[in-house]
Amino acid sequence: MVTRSVRIPGAADGQARLSPRADFAAVALLAEHRAAQPALMLRTLGHACLALYRCGETPLLITDPWLVGSVYWRSWWLQNYPTPEEVDWLANSARVYITHEHPDHFHMPSIRRLGSGPEYLFPALAEQGYLAYKVRHGYRAEAVPPSRWQAIGEAVSILSIPLWNDDSMLLIDTPSALILNLNDAKPPPPVLGSIRHMADRIGKPRILLCSYSPASCINSFLDEAGIVSLKPARHYVDYVCRVCDTLAADFYLPFASQAVFERRDSCWANGYRTSYDDLRRYWQSNAGLLPPYTTLDLADFTHHSIAPEQYRPMERSRVVALTGRRVADEEAAALSAEDVAGLERKLNAFRWFLWLFFPRGFAFQLGERRLGYDARRGRLEESNSSNRGDFVVVIPKLTMKEAVRNNHVSELGISMFVRIRLLRRFDPRKVYALFALLQVDDYGHLESRAALLRWVGRGIRYTFALRLPVPPR
């Protein structure tokens, strides 16, 4: 494959040399290879974007490009935006892999900025509407065959693993290292075991990238005493450490957690983010902890990183203007009978489960309107009671309208401005389960018996019967 020679933008301060915990024969053989080719580099940008490239060349591959703007109804913004020159460089990538549909990974404004030049690769999930969407809009797109190595350059291959939760992982084999991009997939133990078995057979240093901060409604609960936090920052650090040690990772790159929350109704969540300082404070893994926004030489494992004082956040005046405009639009919106009926249909897909979980029912506070859901009757209707049901989900009206009409109601729990007021003592994890159930319907797994069986079958196959080959030599 021929790549263009370019200047790599975005030099970062600080440099250090790292050593894998073990002496790998594969690394010793690399010196001869490097004499013939420029060094292979790994760089993290944006939120969950990695770029794999050779020095002086355009990327062989990038992933999950959220590079401009915001996501989740103007709530999430990047800590550090790439420069226009860096985005131009990324737009020349040969391939773009999208792990899953969440907008902080499948971000259409960023993809439009990158253009139709790259080939867009997607996991072979049970439902693949995103693939048809890309093709329909003039992009080159295809699904990557699961659990099969695919060459993308000289001595560089990728392997995609689809998961039951409509997410995927991407493994990248290079001459001197194995890159394990778990993003925020949270693979179950059997999948981690299969990856570990394959990685042991390959025998190269391992670089793990995965999220380390909450991206759900886990801290969105309120009772009469204030915020009910289900998991502290240390929980997320301990999880990453366990994954690192389970996979015998040599290095960990903080990843897929580089967002801040800027709406006036979501900024509270910044106090519950897991930060890089938390990672350093609680780190107990044998893997080497690297900073966010790092460029890593895959031959000798030297690296440099962008210091926090050099981050490029969005201009403050622009954030204030855009979030203010969104909040004004929320307040001006009105729910229609069609919107209410659509939400009722969505809930009734799980009517009997919800009756078991919440026999007293629950409610939605949508601006000035409160709608109570009675699972036994399967009805969502106006409620004048302030204490009816187990909990109240507080959601801005326009956001609810858009979530129902776009069939992505489960994403409300990720927004950080949706709050859940507990009206009585019960396990808040049941509400978390509600959003997980809604995702099953959002992604089309209940459209037909065939769709449900396809999803369940693939989930079983790629969890309990997963067999990963080593890359061809």
Model region roles, listed by residue range:
Residues 65-66, 75, 161-176, 185, ...:
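Active-site-proximal loop/helix segment associated with metal-binding centers of metalloenzymes
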Residues 62-64, 92-106, 121-125, 180-185, ...:
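Active-site neighborhood of phospho(di)ester-bond hydrolases with catalytic His/Asp-centered motifs
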Residues 1-82:
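Zn-dependent metallo-beta-lactamase
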Residues 190-285:
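Cap/insert and terminal regions of metallo-dependent hydrolase folds
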Residues 8-10, 14-37, 117-177, 281:
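Metallo-beta-lactamase
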Residues 45-57, 145-146, 150-203:
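Catalytic core of the metallo-beta-lactamase
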Residues 33, 55-101, 108-113, 187-204, ...:
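Pre-active-site segment of Zn-dependent metallo-hydrolases
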Residues 297-473:
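Feature captures hydrophobic
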